[in-house]
């Protein structure tokens, strides 16, 4: 590898599987150090060990909706690896229901994980990384569902659209204040992850492929490499931008 992330220290939420695990793997391969998070310790410890030793990657048990836990996460990461330079707010969930059939509990749960959790990470990231000349980068995982309306993903659409616009606000604020913190969003299309695997039935999987102009769904590494770019100094002039990786889905 080309050591594009030498000297970078990243927090990757939801980093124990799927896109988050791929991001962590590529970050370490490019010279970065990573703290991955998740709710299940056994899964998290195994995931970290699959990538490297504790000198380059560790696991911290954390629910992205736990506001106080974010402070503990930052402290643990900086104790292990030094000043945090990068946050990848990747933890997310979806309930496959229309607005009409979504319960209040399901609505609040998806907004809590997908939007509140990203807000906590973005806010604390700005507070802790600003004015330190770290080339700091906050990468917020949205979705193509932040652009389009899906009849069976009402709450998910709302949460991912919220991530998209909130990130723009944060990016402009940081730029105007010369904080040296960039904020961007990544918008995956259909990617081979547990979230997509949970789509109901073989017909849904076939639909995901046929709706994508390239004729197939993406791989987690397709998203991970975009995140490497955004975490690196190569993207020093990119902020408030939307990086769509969807095989042409939203170009239709």
Where are these regions (language model features)?
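Short C-terminal tail/terminal secondary-structure segment
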Residues: 2, 148, 214, 227-228, ...
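Active-site helix of classical SDR
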Residues: 122, 159, 167
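Alpha-helical segment proximal to the catalytic Tyr-Lys
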Residues: 127, 172-176, 236
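Short, small/polar-rich loop/turn modules that mediate ligand/substrate recognition or access, typified
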Residues: 180-182, 238-240
